[in-house]
Amino acid sequence: MKKTKFQRFVYFSSSMVYGDFKKNKAYETDKTNPKEIYGTMKLAGEVATKGLCNFYNIPYTIIRPSAVYGPTDMNQRVTQIFLEKAIKGETLIINGKDEKLDFTFVEDLANGSILAALSKKALNQTFNITFGKAMTLYQYVKILSKYFPRLKYIFKERDHQRPKRGTLSISKAKKLLNYKPYFNLERGMKKYVEFAKSFKEDKK
């Protein structure tokens, strides 16, 4: 690392580092307390990033996304799982009707990440890069049902092993980076469903 000249090291963390959200919004300054392995590993990555970059004098920026979705997403997130089941005509299982996520369209994340990677104001800073407004899983399914009128779903109790999340504050990214997310869930799902349907047709 000493011989490599980095302009900036950008680490993609996760909203899972916060653990259970204690307030209406999660801020970058809030205490991190992950409650499962993924969030723990992401937080460990943040600590390693800060430690190594400080030691080798490398500028860094840490990004915390949440519930990313959009074209080419094959990571078995809830948005992709539900959309895939809807296309196949399978019944959706909603673990927690009122479970909230700050759904973030991939293009907004990409744009925000570029801003964070290039801005001098982002040096050695951590940013929430999300849409900035949480929606429930049920609201997501209702949007999905507009494209799949015969969509069936059942409700089950939320998985208490997973953190209870919600909205991430993006006020810091707005102020320092001029970050302006465009895709609310309605807009984003329109593009996502169009991609998924065209992808299915191409595979025939």
State where each predicted segment sits:
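Conserved Rossmann-fold NAD(P)-dependent oxidoreductase catalytic core, especially the SDR/UDP-sugar
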Residues: M1-I37
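Active-site loop of short-chain dehydrogenase/reductase
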Residues: T4-F9, I58-P59, T91, N124
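Flexible, glycine-rich beta-alpha linker
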Residues: Y18-G19, E36-I37, T61-V78
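Active-site Tyr-X1-5-Lys
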Residues: D20-K22, N33-T61, I87
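Short-chain dehydrogenase/reductase
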Residues: D30, K35-E46, Q76-Q80, D102-F103, ...
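Hydrophobic alpha-helix immediately C-terminal to the catalytic Tyr-X-X-X-Lys motif of short-chain
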Residues: A44, A48, L52, F82, ...
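C-terminal substrate-binding subdomain of Rossmann-fold SDR/epimerase-dehydratase oxidoreductases
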Residues: A86, E90-K204
